Amino acid sequence: MNNLPPGDGGRPGERCYRARAMESPTQDRPYRIVVLGATGFTGRLVAEYLARSVGASLPWAIAGRSVAKLEEVHRALVAINPECSKVGVVQADVGDAPSLDRLAASTSVLLTTVGPYARHGMPVVRACVEQGTDYVDITGEPAFVKETVERYHEAAKAKGLRIVSCCGFDSIPHDLGVLYTVLQLPEGEPVSIEGMVRAKGGVSGGTWHSAINAFSDLRSAMSAGRPSKEPLPGGRKVRASKAGLHFDKARSAWLCPLPTIDPWIVLRSARGLDRYGPDFRYGHFAEVRSTAVLLGGAVGIAGVAALSQFKPTREWLLGRIAPGEGPSEEVRAKGWFTVTFRASTRSKTIETQVSGGEAGYAETSKMVAESALCLALDRDRLPPHTGVVTTAMGMGEALIERLQRAGIAFRVL
């Protein structure tokens, strides 16, 4: 097996070892990708996706706290693909900084699904920046991403690293969907784009816990999600649409503004990429085709947000779904998503769409796995932007092409 040598506390003959720090270039490290959190619901789906898509064609590993649970996942991977007997198993704990340093130093790209990221993400980012390792995650937490930019962008940029958050349904379909749309438009003209989301799927315990924790500090989350107002070179303008809830006759649907991290990510990409034009505006909406569903969703979200403000009711909500649980394979198989973009410049109007299967887990695991593979294998095709970057800035068209080959559709309507 392609495992790391035992560190302190490791026993000869074990498949699970503690990672040892290495000073060699990342391509000479034991692994090209490590999946941290592989025993969780989404992390396991990521590992299973890699087992099916790459097998042992490149060296990769799974990592987490529990040796026993990691061994269980490893056996499942071997059952999917016997080549995965070569997949490494590494013990690491987000609460143990030395173990994270050893883990980050063992791989070219560290993929983490361990959330909530506001609680567990920053130590992993720190280890990656200090050890010279690229990083991807699936967070949708604005405060965490903003803090990552503030604390580590310059250090990561100085080392030529790509620290890329939001590599799942938050926010790849939106961020790369807008990039794909912009590339269909003439250069040098003002651009206005609306993104309209529809989806069907389930909820995992990890996502539920992250959402409740975000609702508990809603003011900070909303503040972190506001786009930057710093002036851009050359007088470029990047702005959020001010359109509120409205009925769209062309789509026969209500368009409800979505206060998620996605528009913040899109606008950050627009600020960093001149190709988005001299004056860029973006609006982000949920597309709801039933008034009853719209009202029911609004009441439900408001109720959960209110209950999240108080410790007793917050703990009750957290107990509804345990971490590590999630929708069944049958539910995931029936899920789907579409994000439709309506774009206009002075000389052209188009509609595009990104679509795929169940968004929260089936496609999220695919998206983040392909993001890690893109960083590990496509470096000669990546945009020049480094630091704490978005998927559009850090991977761009190379990742769009990977996702298309993996079955996620990007198309002009």
Q: What do these predicted regions represent?
A:
Residues E23-P25, L183-L413:
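C-terminal catalytic/substrate-binding lobe primarily of soluble NAD(P)-dependent oxidoreductases
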Residues N3-P5, G9-G10, R15, S24, ...:
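Short, low-complexity intrinsically disordered segments enriched in A/P/G/S/L with frequent Arg
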